[in-house]
């Protein structure tokens, strides 16, 4: 079926309109062959290129090139008449009707998947070029070898999550307890159980510090001085001077230093911050967030000698939205802690800014609802428990007809988002680390240090 093509901007001829979609990452001959075959099906070829955020929301963690670089590469093939951006699920139906499309073309690896589009246009599955793919090309490019320090539960979750991100391999692990390290490597398919820290550092390009938090500073410093990139688990460090020193070393060595704060990198929180910064609920006047877990009294998390306690274990989570949204210029903080054996089982912190307030509750020996509420002059945002790994939040207003529910994916354990950001930053060091900045991380360390030093800490019996 042929039709007159609408003349938009005087560029379109008359004839059949063909549309195809893809990420087109690391453009290769397979992509070019598909575009050529799609062009042969009609007179005008429209190509939809996915955005970085849409890829991330679909769980596509391995995209190497930015959307603009991918768009430019598609244009330069010479087969494409028009490029559009694919931003949301279901857009294909909208585009087919909007552009009066005759033929939808896609690779044969999607055979049958897009048959539902036959209601709107002809669907053609094009033969795929064998022996080449973006994934294969990415794997042939530089791969970051990651060494893991620590073999606890979080390290065990890191290894399978890293497999969802291209451009990295877990090459080695280290634990002073050699038997534990050997078992961990055997269980997770890691080729080397390093006998010493130096041996680990000699066999990796980057280090994931997943040891007890009171050891983060020493391990991160040793790795940076050895010229390694560092991803350190939360809480990063517990003292301001340590945070400042580590970032100073990272800068001097031109190495990436990141905190493995999965909330900061997950799609829902990223969108939440962007919406709030745009003024969707007006001016923010208050934030309240809670993170509590009931912990066995014999746990190391409640060991005073190992800097255990609710603040040291959990405060990094609510500190993220408070500092991210209200800033680093905190006028005053008061801490109210219920203590047992010199460890805070539950702490409430109250923040005062010039034009806003904030508070959080953290606990290891008490339980409360783990939600977050952000109040503004025009409405508020409610994030249900567990807000720190949310895939959903609500915008609520005085006029309930304006309320909105926002859903975003949270894949697996969520660690793949921070790993993706870490690997991407190493491979593309010109990128700006804006999702969790050095200044914000240092501000969090300052709050942790204030608590450890007893500044405005009120201990309750």
In which residue ranges do the predicted regions lie?
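Nucleotidyltransferase catalytic core that binds NTPs
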Residues: 1-143
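N-terminal Rossmann-fold NAD(P) dinucleotide-binding loop
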Residues: 31, 155-158, 216
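N-terminal Rossmann-like dinucleotide-binding module
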Residues: 143-188, 414, 423, 460-461
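Beta-loop-alpha module in the N-terminal Rossmann-like domain of NAD(P)-dependent dehydrogenases
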Residues: 179, 188-246
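C-terminal helix-rich "cap/oligomerization" subdomain common to oxidoreductases
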Residues: 199, 206-208, 406, 421-461
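Rossmann-fold dehydrogenase core element
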Residues: 244-262, 283-287
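Predominantly a Rossmann-like dinucleotide-binding segment in NAD(P)-dependent oxidoreductases
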Residues: 263-333
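Contiguous beta-strand/loop segments that form the cofactor/metal-binding neighborhood of enzyme cores
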Residues: 313, 319-390, 420-429
């Amino acid at each position: 079926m042929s039709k007159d093509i609408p003349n938009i901007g005087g560029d379109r001829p008359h004839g059949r309109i063909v549309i195809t979609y893809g990420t087109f990452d690391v453009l290769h001959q397979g992509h070019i062959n598909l575009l050529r075959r799609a062009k042969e099906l009609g007179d005008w070829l429209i190509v939809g290129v996915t955005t970085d955020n849409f890829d991330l929301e679909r769980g596509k963690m391995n995209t190497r090139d930015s959307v603009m670089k991918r768009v430019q590469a598609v244009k330069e093939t010479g087969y494409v008449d028009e490029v559009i951006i694919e931003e949301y699920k279901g857009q294909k139906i909208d585009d087919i009707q909007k552009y009066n499309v005759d033929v939808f073309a896609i690779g044969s690896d999607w055979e049958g998947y897009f048959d539902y589009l036959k209601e709107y246009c002809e669907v053609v599955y094009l033969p795929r070029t064998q022996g080449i793919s973006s994934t294969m090309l990415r794997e042939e490019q530089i791969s970051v070898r990651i060494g893991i320090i620590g073999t606890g539960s979080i390290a065990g979750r890191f290894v399978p999550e890293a497999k969802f991100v291209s451009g990295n391999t877990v090459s080695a692990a280290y634990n002073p307890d050699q038997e534990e390290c050997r078992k961990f490597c055997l269980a997770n398919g890691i080729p080397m159980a390093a006998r010493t820290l130096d041996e680990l550092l000699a066999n990796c390009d980057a280090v994931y510090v997943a040891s007890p938090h009171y050891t983060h500073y020493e391990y991160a410093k040793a790795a940076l001085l050895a010229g390694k990139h560092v991803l350190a688990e939360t809480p990063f460090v517990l003292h301001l001077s340590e945070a400042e020193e580590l970032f100073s070393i990272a800068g001097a060595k031109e190495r990436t230093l990141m905190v493995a704060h999965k909330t900061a990198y997950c799609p829902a929180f990223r969108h939440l911050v962007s919406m709030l910064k745009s003024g969707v609920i007006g001016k923010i006047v208050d934030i309240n967030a809670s993170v509590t877990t009931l912990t066995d009294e014999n746990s190391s998390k409640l060991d005073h000698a190992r800097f255990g306690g609710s603040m040291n274990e959990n405060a990094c989570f609510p500190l993220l939205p408070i500092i991210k949204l209200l800033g680093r210029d905190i006028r005053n903080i008061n801490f109210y802690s219920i203590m047992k054996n010199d460890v805070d089982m539950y702490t409430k912190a109250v923040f005062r800014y010039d034009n806003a307030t904030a508070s959080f509750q953290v606990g290891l020996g008490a339980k409360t609802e783990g939600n977050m509420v952000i109040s503004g002059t025009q409405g508020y945002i409610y994030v249900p428990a567990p807000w720190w790994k949310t895939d959903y939040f609500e915008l609520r207003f005085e006029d309930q007809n304006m309320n909105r529910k926002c859903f975003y994916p949270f894949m697996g354990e969520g660690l793949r988002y921070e790993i993706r950001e870490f690997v991407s930053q190493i491979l593309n060091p010109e990128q700006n680390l804006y999702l969790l900045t050095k200044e914000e991380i240092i501000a969090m360390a300052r709050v942790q240090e204030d608590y450890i030093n007893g500044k405005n800490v009120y201990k309750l019996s």
